Amino acid sequence: KRVKEAKPEACIDGVHLQSQIAQGQEVIVGMVRDPQFGALMMFGSGGVEVEGLKDVAFALAPLTQAEAEKMIRKTWAGRKLKGFRNIPAADEESVIDVLIKLSWLAFENESIEEIEINPLRVLSTGAVAVDVRMRLKGEKP
């Protein structure tokens, strides 16, 4: 009603509603395909911190549970998942699960050149991909 009053010429075809995501820690999870080594997985500080902190770890896909845990432990973002000062602990197991599944997706699908989930919001239970970007073979970066 208010739209019609404010902008009578506006044409609204539909509305897309999304639930508000709870506060959580933001990390980046991704993959880039190296011509020599194949799928290279990435984990680190996400959101706006990714450019400033350069807090990332890399490992070749596919990842095992132990390799995913090791990647996470190498970073400040990983240590923060355990909780730090006024930052509550977040669900590290969900991040491990995302890393492993994403690594197998990349390993089994060579047409995927890049995947970036930034941020992956890690909650006290679970994680939500807030923004995802994927580039396939042949697409320009």
Question: At which residue positions do the language-model features occur?
Answer:
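ATP-dependent carboxylate/acyl-activation modules
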Residues: K1-P141
